[in-house]
Amino acid sequence: MFPVFHLSGESRRRMLQTALRFPHVFKARAEDSHKGTFGTLAVVGGSAGMSGAPVLAASAAMYLGCGKVRAGFNQDTLPFAVIAGFPEIMLDTADGLTKRQGINAWTAGCGLGTDAAAVETVAAVLARNRDEAVVLDADALNILSTDAETRNLARGCKNLILTPHPAEAARLLGTTVAQVQADRTAAVRKIGAILGATVVLKGHKTLVAASDTEIYVNESGNAGLATAGSGDVLGGIIGSLLAQGVPVFEAACAGAWLHGAAADVIKESAGIAAGLSAGEIAPAARWLRNWITESM
């Protein structure tokens, strides 16, 4: 049963106008497309007790149209044989997944932990083919903030996106959350300059910056996104767009916008802000992407 979503005339007009900024995201699919056309995303995370984080990211990637999704868990054995509700997602250990070929993009860090195995996993992802796009989130960012070798590998990654919340940004900069929030523009620019990455500084009016672009200020979203797992979903959305061939900066900006706009769709359709669960975001983003594509 598909959820029923709708938007008012003004919301439709506003969202269609914004979508014009993301031409690679909102385009019709060719009739002769196949799963290989839309790329393979690898999601690595999920230390013991945190298996749900990569599931949220991987399922979001499926909802946003990725051709194939693999999920790797930072555990010695798989936490489950198949993901209930998402049998399409192929499972592996994090160590096993980092050795696989045929990956177009990565989302790493969701519930990963910061133990030695986690550090090795992030390093292995960054040391692969430097043309593979990489999203680092959550614990992968915490590892970057403390491990010099991993930071050096990150600087050599051509297509790198970092998605810190203010506390993670503060750790990357060696400063405080208050200082990050006092000048978010300076913070997002500085992180990008230090690590040579596109940076998505999450929060109210998420900022996206790359070294050669102006800062994108995201206007979508509402307080419903303040829920556990929301960031994992964002990482999956951005990773999915990268795997599908969307350019790095556009994928970061469009991912942030779709993530927030999905929450706006849910609020307008069902009146839900408080109590929104992270798993409800991606189905709304899927609906929105398809509705916009058909409307343009």
UniProtKB/Swiss-Prot annotation:
EC class name: lyase
The keyword Magnesium is assigned to this record: no
Keywords: ATP-binding, Lyase, NAD, NADP, Nucleotide-binding
EC number from the UniProt entry: 4.2.1.136
Claim: Lyase is one of the keywords in the record: yes
PROSITE patterns, per the entry: YJEF_C_3 (PS51383)
Binding site for (6S)-NADPHX: A53, G113, H165, D232
Binding site for AMP: K202, G203, H204, K205, T206, G231
Entry-linked InterPro entries: CARKD, Ribokinase-like
GO biological process, one term: metabolite repair
Residue span(s) of domain YjeF C-terminal: 18-292
GO molecular function: ADP-dependent NAD(P)H-hydrate dehydratase activity; ATP binding; NAD(P)HX epimerase activity
Role of this protein: Catalyzes the dehydration of the S-form of NAD(P)HX at the expense of ADP, which is converted to AMP. Together with NAD(P)HX epimerase, which catalyzes the epimerization of the S- and R-forms, the enzyme allows the repair of both epimers of NAD(P)HX, a damaged form of NAD(P)H that is a result of enzymatic or heat-dependent hydration.
Assembly and interaction partners: Homotetramer.
The protein, known as: ADP-dependent (S)-NAD(P)H-hydrate dehydratase
Taxonomic lineage: Bacteria, Pseudomonadati, Pseudomonadota, Betaproteobacteria, Neisseriales
Gene name, Swiss-Prot/TrEMBL: nnrD
